[in-house]
Design a protein with these regions (language model features):
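Repeated loop/turn-to-beta-strand initiation elements of outer-membrane beta-barrel proteins
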Residues: 23-25, 57-62, 99-103, 138-148
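Extracellular loop and loop/strand-boundary signature of outer-membrane beta-barrel proteins
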Residues: 34-37, 74-80, 117-124, 150-153
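Residues that define the transmembrane beta-barrel architecture of outer-membrane proteins
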Residues: 21, 42-46, 81-87, 124-130, ...
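Cleavable N-terminal export/targeting peptides
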Residues: 1-22
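Outer-membrane beta-barrel strand-turn architecture
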Residues: 19, 51-56, 95-99, 111, ...
């Protein structure tokens, strides 16, 4: 029974390969937030995305964001400007639906960098962590879509999250 179930699943995934396969690019905006004991901070970032649809169910993605607006927090009597940037590599698992809304989950590894500026001095720290999230894409056509996703990572002492709105273009 297990062999039959496995064979049916593999056959279903293989037949879907012809309908969804290829390169896609995305660009959008993200709200990147981090929380450490005693501090919360975030930034507004521009986001770039590159991915490859293996089939209707599986895609591989790379993502990069750069801060365009940083947060300001007060530590003791000093104002600190702080922002977070990230890059990640993900496997995206899509639930095929009959309509234009395609929900998905993704998981992978992310590397984040937080930089704090006081006056003319900037200090940066970076770390890598397992990252996971959920989202959905609204397919406007076979070539374009808009997606909204939430991704989280735990960097030990720091918890981080990314809420992104991205336009997707398929080739």
């Amino acid at each position: 029974m297990l062999r039959l179930s496995s064979a049916v699943l593999i056959a279903a995934m293989a037949t879907s390969t012809a309908s969804a396969e290829g390169l896609y690019l995305g660009a959008g905006f993200a709200s990147v937030n981090a929380e450490e004991p005693g501090y919360k901070y975030g930034s507004t970032n521009i986001l770039g995305l590159i991915g490859y649809e293996v089939n209707d169910y599986l895609s591989l993605e790379g993502e990069l964001s750069v801060a365009i607006s940083k947060d300001k927090i007060r530590i003791a009597s000093t104002n600190v400007e702080i922002g977070t940037e990230h890059m990640g590599a993900y496997a995206k698992l899509t639930l095929p639906t009959a309509g234009p809304i395609k929900p998905y989950a993704r998981f992978g590894m992310a590397r984040a960098e937080a930089s704090a500026t006081v006056g003319s001095t900037t200090v940066s720290v970076n770390d890598s962590a397992f990252s996971y999230g959920i989202g959905a894409e609204w397919e406007l056509s076979e070539q374009t879509g808009i997606r909204l996703d939430y991704t989280a990572a735990d960097y030990g002492v720091t918890d981080a999250s990314v809420l992104a709105l991205t336009s997707v273009f398929r080739f």
